[in-house]
Amino acid sequence: MSPDELCATAERLGVDDARELRKSELVLAVLEAHADRRGETHAEGVLEVLGDGFGFLRNADAMFAPGTDDVYVSPSQIRRFGLRTGDIVRGTVRAPKESERYFALLRVESVEGGAPDQHPHRDDFDARPAGPATTRLDLRGAPPSVRLAELYAPLGLGQRILIKAPPRGGKSGLLGELTRALVANHPTAHVTLVAIDVRPEEAGELGRGLDGHVAVSTLADPPARHVQLVEMLVERGKRTAERGGHAIVVIDSLGRLARAWNLVVPASGRTLIGALDAAAITRVRRLWASARQLESGGALTLVATLTTESGQRIDEVMADELAETASAEWVLAKGGSAEAPRFDVDATFSRQAEALVDDVAAWRHAAAQPVARVTPAAAATADLPSLIAALA
């Protein structure tokens, strides 16, 4: 519902000064007005299950940030219907009583768009067998340098794709262009670029041209918020893959995520180089391992950045810890820019490249040739087979 539609609904329900309220306050006022009239109303949100067993329906438009318009979900409902973090849940809710702060879910009407009783016996995502990536990500429309990097290291659905970049090496521009190409060429996939702990002025730049596909936390947010945002998006991606869909989450960056987790997780007693707790690394590795192509379902693809040559010990530790874990790596070289990133072709690779191209012999030959024969216009608009043919 757009802000104007929300205001119109609020005014129709008799909410005072509706156009002066923030969106979260307006949503809460509309829910309360509905509840006052009928005793109960309906709500839908993305479930976050907390450590004590209860949960809340979060607002996706608010990037899952905790708010006063969240709906409380009891532990008994979560157990009964086998609900998990990331599920889209719809149901009947009631207004908070005097001693309560939140609306409460009375009845679960649907989970992931289906009847709630279909879900208690779902197989756990992490327990499902994974297969090799066989569907190539289509990057037509991306800048020529990105298309040529794709020639050397094709990317596939269900992969763990690591983008290593030095400071000011064009990483931010690359991520934006990459996400735009994924959104344009994979309309049925759920594509989200999530940037955490960024400068406030960067937040608006990242979202330009990517409405609905960007989630951001800024350096003004606490570390727990950075962690929660990334985890919610990855868990939402798992639920999408479980029902046969495809989700692509682009994370900027794993280094900042490790720093945030280092401040959030209980100390394990094992501190590594750079004052990084071993428990924080475990959390990053567990999340990174989530990417996969399910044999009998969809795929969760993770694309993540890692800063190199930054002088920060945490970045060095993460590079060591994640060595050999990526399905593909794109490595940026110094001297690039947001408009024209430069790739270290020798270090850029894809472990499953041969499964992602139709003519393996032609691809091998093309990848060994100089790229000067491909014009920028052709690189940006051609599909991968055409690029291979141009260099064959």
Kindly give the residue locations of the regions a language model identified.
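Residue-level signature of catalytic and energy-coupling elements of molecular machines
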Residues: 6, 26, 55, 74, ...
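P-loop NTP-binding catalytic core
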Residues: 83-85, 96-163
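S1/OB-fold single-stranded RNA-binding interface
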Residues: 1, 17, 36-92
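P-loop NTPase catalytic core
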Residues: 168-172, 176-392
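Basic helix-extension-helix modules of the SAP/HeH family
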Residues: 1-38
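Phosphate-interacting basic helix/loop segments used at nucleotide- and nucleic-acid interfaces
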Residues: 39-43, 144-148, 233-238, 287
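Glycine/charge-rich, flexible interdomain linkers and switch-proximal surface loops
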Residues: 38-53, 95, 99-116, 250
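Short, charged beta-turn/beta-strand-edge "cap" motif at the junction between a beta-strand
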Residues: 77, 93-99, 167-168
